[in-house]
Amino acid sequence: MGQKVHPRGFRLGVSADWQTRWFNEKNYATWLKEDEEIRKVVKNAYSQAGISEVFIERPDNESVTITIKTARPGVIIGKKGAEIGKLREDLEKELNRRVIVNVEEIKTPETDAQLVAENIAGRIEKRASYKRAMKRALSDALRKGATGVKVMVSGRLAGAEIARREWYLRGRLPLQTVRAVVDYGTATAKTKYGTIGIKVWIYKGDAEV
């Protein structure tokens, strides 16, 4: 039986980049745990900011550089930089290191797989039709320039007694092509019938190798 590989891990170093950029044998476990904590703090503090990814770099033992990719940079930066300043201070106190926080705006959130998955999850939690939410995400992504989109939901859809899986695909999605830039995102919708998993693949063309 064929096994599925993670679309991002399959393309690392070719058409995808690492979210964590450092190497240290001595402090590996400690730093890895810190990275998870940093991502959790950032996403919990700015859950309404449309955060897609958090990149972490450690150029040396005394500093951490955090780059946040978001659809709403103003929410994170705050008035006159107040919010981002508070975030930096809180992280420096927690990590006991110098922290640099950068914010990158996502120009087209409709073609960001993680944001699309979270948007569908939000609609399902508000009791919108999962089919309508999926079809709207597909049309929005294609309208904004995506070459191909696949959306899959699984769970007790519409409160059904038996869990099932449904998916829609529009355009091309070459999952076995390493140079293909395929963005991948997941989210979970919590409903009164249980959780519904959402997976999104967005093909944006080929990278120059």
UniProtKB/Swiss-Prot annotation:
InterPro entries: KH_dom (IPR004087), KH_dom-like_a/b (IPR015946), KH_dom_type_2 (IPR004044), KH_sf_prok-type (IPR009019), Ribosomal_S3_C_sf (IPR036419), Ribosomal_uS3_bac-typ (IPR005704), Ribosomal_uS3_C (IPR001351), Ribosomal_uS3_CS (IPR018280)
Annotated coiled-coil segments of the chain: none
CDD domains reported in the protein's UniProt record: KH-II_30S_S3
Domain of life assignment: Bacteria
Biological process, per Gene Ontology: translation
Family according to the record: Belongs to the universal ribosomal protein uS3 family.
Keywords assigned: Ribonucleoprotein, Ribosomal protein, RNA-binding, rRNA-binding
Name of protein: Small ribosomal subunit protein uS3
Keyword Ribonucleoprotein: yes
Positions of transmembrane segments: none
